Each structure stands twice: as structure tokens, then as C-alpha cells.
Amino acid sequence: MIYIPKKIRYRKHHRGRLKGVASKGNNLFFASCGLQALESSWITSQQMEAARRACTRKVKRHGKLFMRFFPDKPVTYRSAETRMGSGKGTPRDWVAVIKPGKILYELKGIPEPLARKALKLASAKLPLKTKFIFKKE
């Protein structure tokens, strides 16, 4: 499943810079354990889905997985060997801009050792360093 916004205001965005830390979405909200980003990066919708699948396969569809980010930024590409000029390329991918401290995934209703293994599998599919965080209740 590819994640794409239903409606967007502008078809093409500036690329922007990855700086600063996450001010929102940096605390566990839905569950007691989660995966937190340690560096900034773009995560594509394909990477999101691969990580989600790896995690749900490990826990055998028990518990509940919460994804705390969504790819809402279009990334454009020019075809290879194209001359300079003639406008910006067409949007091809959708990415989520991730900053350090952002909670990516949360797992609920699963024992901590199994959740740790599942989220480690998910982190292997992502292009950034992450850490497992656990909230004692």
C-alpha cells in the first residue's frame, strides 16, 4: 500500500533543509513502547510500508501498531540525460520529513521483549538511526 495525501494545495514543493529537532510527536501517546528517530531524514511511503510489514509479521498480527508520521511532501525527479531548464520535474515520490526525537511507530498490547524485536526489524527498513523507548506505567 502506498501512502499518498488525498488532497494537496500545491503539486510541487521546495526541498527544504533538514535541521532542528522535533518539537511535536516526541512523546509516547498511544502505547507503552515505540521507535524514536535519532537523526533527520526523509522516509518514503515505500520504506514506511516495508517497516510496517516487518513489524506486523514479527508480532503475528497481535496487538496494535500505530504509525505516527505520514508522507505529505512530494519529491520531483527529472529524467536522466535531460538538458537544463524547461521547468521542474514531475512528482514521483512522497516523503515524510523526520527530525530527531520524532516517534515513528508505537506498539500496544505486546510484551516488551517481543516489541523490541519487532521494532528492531522495522528499524532495519528505515534510512535513519533509531532507538527503542519504553514507558513504564
Curated annotation (Swiss-Prot):
HAMAP family: Ribosomal_uL16
UniProt-listed NCBIfam families: rplP_bact (TIGR01164)
Protein name (record): Large ribosomal subunit protein uL16c
Keyword tags: Plastid, Ribonucleoprotein, Ribosomal protein
Family annotation (InterPro entries): Ribosomal_uL16, Ribosomal_uL16_bact-type, Ribosomal_uL16_CS, Ribosomal_uL16_dom, Ribosomal_uL16_sf
Family: Belongs to the universal ribosomal protein uL16 family.
One GO MF term: structural constituent of ribosome
Keyword RNA-binding included in the entry's annotation: no
UniProt KW Manganese keyword: no
PROSITE patterns: RIBOSOMAL_L16_2 (PS00701)
Gene Ontology BP term (one): mitochondrial translation
GO (cellular component) term, any one: plastid
Cellular localization per UniProt: Plastid
Quaternary context: Part of the 50S ribosomal subunit.
Chief subcellular location: plastid
